[in-house]
A protein has these predicted regions:
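Carbohydrate transferase catalytic cores enriched for Leloir-type hexosyltransferases
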Residues: 1-289
């Protein structure tokens, strides 16, 4: 930074926090997405406990984590992408200034009317005679895909036979364009994750006008309307909601659903680039005082 005309240094990922200079001449801000690796934990989900973060990092990773924590301690302000992350940060770094700046969603990219994608792009993974439900994400334990499988297995037979379940990212790899297609055409996204730093898939689904059924858990429950949230471990509550989705699909004659404009508007109001820009500007002003 020596000789630079910069007013502020922003490191946008805590995994690079070791780069925070010592005795920096300008304020240093670091964005913290989550503390899953700095503060690994187990979260109870019904009668099981789900690990979040690496419970037993190796020698080199432990050394890295120590350097990252020291870098975060040197920063002047920690930007957090969710209220949950903000609470975690304030517990780990008491007295450290924090600011909430959520991620942004590119509404134009997901827009089902302004940027529509043909369902034909999913042909090799799809059955357009059935009610398409999707999950998006890895198969790590905290994503709880086994819970979704339990839900599907518990559906009435006449409903289950009409369901085409597509697990994107964990079982099927899609291109970026195919992912847009899936979110624009699925009858619903199922998102049972037990813990997220933010929760991109449901936010992107809503931007595409796709109904969301999600576990009422942090931090994704901060950015999802209450009507889309269900108890995380209540299989029958999820079954009932899927049955409703199927019934609506059946009543429509199996034709593609209309985009849910209320969900698109929800994302526009809270997660647009403009909303993020305003929050980021306020955070920078705080750091530069």
């Amino acid at each position: 930074m020596e000789g630079s005309e910069a007013d502020l240094l922003h490191i946008t990922d805590q995994e690079q926090a070791h780069l925070v200079p010592e005795d920096c001449e300008v304020p240093v801000v670091v964005t913290v997405h989550d503390l899953f690796h700095l503060r690994p934990r187990e979260i109870k989900a019904g009668d099981i406990r789900v690990p979040v973060g690496n419970q037993r990092p190796g020698l080199f990773r432990r050394r890295d984590l120590k350097r990252l924590k020291a870098g975060l301690e040197r920063a002047d302000l920690l930007i957090c992408i969710s209220e949950m992350t903000k609470r975690d940060v304030e517990r780990m770094f008491p007295g450290k200034p924090t600011a909430l700046v959520r991620h942004q969603i590119d509404l134009d990219y997901w827009d089902p009317e302004g940027n529509p994608r043909s369902r034909d792009l999913l042909t090799e993974h799809d059955d357009d005679s059935k009610c398409l439900l999707i999950t998006v994400g890895s198969d790590e334990p905290r994503k709880r895909l086994d819970f979704v499988r339990d839900v599907i297995a518990s559906l009435p037979e006449e409903v289950a036979q009409d369901i085409h379940m597509l697990h994107i990212g964990s079982e099927v790899e899609l291109s970026d364009e195919q992912l847009v297609t899936a979110l624009q055409h699925a009858e619903a996204l199922l998102f049972p994750s037990i813990s997220e730093g933010f929760g991109y898939p449901p936010a992107e689904a809503m931007a595409a006008g796709c109904p969301v059924i999600a576990a009422n858990l942090p931090a994704h429950n901060e950015v999802i309307p209450e009507r889309c949230l269900l108890p995380a471990t209540d299989v029958m509550a999820w079954v009932d909601e899927v049955v409703k989705v199927h019934a609506a699909w059946k009543r429509a004659g199996g034709v593609p659903r209309n985009p849910d404009d209320s969900l698109i508007d929800y994302v526009r109001d809270s997660l647009s680039p403009e909303a993020q820009g305003e929050a980021l500007s306020r955070a920078y002003e705080t750091a530069c005082r």
